[in-house]
């Protein structure tokens, strides 16, 4: 049986556990589970091998990272090694803010604008 690795020495694991517990408490209309390593988040086979039984394991729609550096690295890996199109939007203020990289292609810039428009609703 898989036991989530929540370690005092790794603050992001404690934060992931707190988010999981908060999601349960607030009865969100979403499945939230963590901490999960990247492979267990995106690979059902990896999660299965490690005995992780959760609907999120291997089928995550959203990945949360512990800091901006980790998030930036993850996005760049997905863009440059996996051919992903990244869109960036900051929400929570009066209006959404479009975030782009200086090296973004036109498709990524347009995707960010489209995501901001959707966030307006």
Question: Where do the model's predicted regions map?
Answer:
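Short active-site-adjacent structural elements
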Residues: 41-42, 71-76, 106-108
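A C-terminal functional module that forms or caps the active site or interfaces directly
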Residues: 47-93
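Structural signal for hydrophobic packing residues in well-ordered secondary-structure cores
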Residues: 20-27, 82, 116-120
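Short, small-residue-biased leader/transition segments that mark boundaries at the very start
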Residues: 1-2
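Conserved strand-to-helix beginnings and helix N-cap segments that scaffold or border functional pockets
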Residues: 9-13, 75, 109-110
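General beta-strand structural signal in soluble alpha/beta enzymes
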Residues: 31-35, 66, 91, 99
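C-terminal functional extensions of proteins
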Residues: 77, 84-121
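Active-site rim loops that border cofactor/substrate pockets in soluble metabolic enzymes
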Residues: 7-61
């Amino acid at each position: 049986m898989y036991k989530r690795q929540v370690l005092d020495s790794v603050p992001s694991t404690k934060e992931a556990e707190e988010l999981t517990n908060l999601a349960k408490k607030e009865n969100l209309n979403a499945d939230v589970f963590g901490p999960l390593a990247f492979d267990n988040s995106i690979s059902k086979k990896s999660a299965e091998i490690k005995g992780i039984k959760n609907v999120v394991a291997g089928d995550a729609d959203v990945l949360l990272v512990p800091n901006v550096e980790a998030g930036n690295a993850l996005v760049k890996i997905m863009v440059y090694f996996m051919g992903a199109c990244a869109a960036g939007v900051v929400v929570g203020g009066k209006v959404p803010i479009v975030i782009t990289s200086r090296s973004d292609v036109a498709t990524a810039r347009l995707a960010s604008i489209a995501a901001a428009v959707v966030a307006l609703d």
